[in-house]
């Protein structure tokens, strides 16, 4: 299950009572009712915890296990060509006394990616350029844990208050020499409030996020006198040193501050929520003896809207999002100094900065998305739907002195449809998407560098400039089961997909999930 599906499940549970009748709320909510609640909700699409009670929530939860496999011919070099995963996911919305409503989530994902190279870190693309890796392909094991705890109050006059904590741990280990291990800690704390007047609500959320990723050391099982380890500084610029993994350490620490401002209009037949936000991040990069190759800065601006309107037979949903992100890296030239204490004889090691290249590397990202879905709905749930959507993405990477640049643009648009059969016990969901690339450019100052030939040129020729289409099909069957007088809705879901690229490469994936709603 990918991130989009997980977010969808969150929305379903958050908004289970938005337009459901009171008798149904006391019963077990099935697949059809979850889809209706998700489509009609507004605040569950945001991270503003104060808005939890504006969607009229009830106690509801879900738990599931999922196993998946993906094989990819059409991929980038640093991604790998095969992935096996096992995931456990559970979440719960719960009243906490008279005045509070809470949400909790636990998500554990483990897996193995094969034939990945040139990157030993999690954020390889369009991010901090000071990464590292080996040109020798290998398998990588990952273990990721994601926790979320959010609580919102009921109304105190026109006011509501909330607090949300997102906490993630991750481990990415390479299983072939040189054997690196990347450890990640990421948490985000976001207090919020809303103010309601008439049909309108204003919301404000501020957040602090700290991201830390560390490669404490790199080990080897065998001795290879020709094995190089590379450190990158942006675009094709990579320095490969024989035995460079010996004593190597790298740490990334990012501090981000941001806010979200929301405005919502809610009525029984028509509702809309618009949210705008700004984030600013500052990320330090450290090595042995606090060596600093550079510093990375990010600015992110986003605006999003969700609008729904209801007729006796139909529920219309329109969603739009626009986001612009700009990042730049200052590159340092530092010299190691060794100071010897005349009394103890101990040496002190430190790095002194001699030169700074301001904004030597720059990233610009623009993402726009627009979607419309027409749902056939009754008071009990959605019986079927059809939707269209499109996304536009623009990527620019630039490196100065010497000058190198990369530009990538594509449009991705698709059609989706689904329908429930046998009293909505059995659901079929299908989707078809096209990816059209345009206006791509790659200009490298050193086209003969190993990183340029094996990564940038290879990805540009075989991935970035290639059109593709993909199709997916999901089958879901659910069955209520009563244990000790309590009924839960158990389900089993089989999901598959296929991608075909214009260069005759293809990808395939399949997953099986078993779970229950309680």
Please tell me what each predicted stretch does.
Residues 82-88, 141-147, 181-189, 253-259, ...:
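Residues that define the transmembrane beta-barrel architecture of outer-membrane proteins
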Residues 73-79, 115-121, 173-180, 215-221, ...:
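Outer-membrane beta-barrel translocator domains and adjoining extracellular loop/strand segments
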